[in-house]
Amino acid sequence: KNLKSLFISLNSIAEKYKLPIVVSTHPRTKNRIEKMEEKIKPNKLIKFLKPQGFFDYINLQQFSKCVISDSGTITEESSILKFPAIMIRQAHERPEGMDKGTLIMSGLEKERILESLEVVIKQYEDEIVPQIVDDYNVDNVSSKVVKIILSYTEYVNRTVWKKDFSIKSN
């Protein structure tokens, strides 16, 4: 049912905007799509591609008219990288992104996605880009991560992995 709703929505987007639509497609999903293609014919503008590498995917996001995703990290990505986005989930775990207006949570219904697309695209065309979420705008993250890892490595090795680090005398 969800895949069918997504197909209907993507076809409507392709018809309305006349732009290529790139869908990062996992192999299992690709198999399901191939079984459905006869029933719901995808618009020729829709391209089902294998999952991209990290940097290629980020590049796709940054140069997209809008990113439509069910990813759990789309809120952070959209906020930090400042690209328009719509989350097609019914719920999420990042309320701070919603509070800042980083993206729109639409669900899978065609009308809601089309309505959300209009709003998000207009905002970015008018250069009304949401501010980065404060929680995501932290300085020196890599330095902090290194310190945390160094601080807890021995503890985790000892308590979780049961490695013995005691010094043995001769």
Q: What residues fall within each predicted segment?
A:
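Nucleotide-activated sugar donor-binding and catalytic core shared by glycosyltransferases
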Residues: 1-19, 24, 29-170
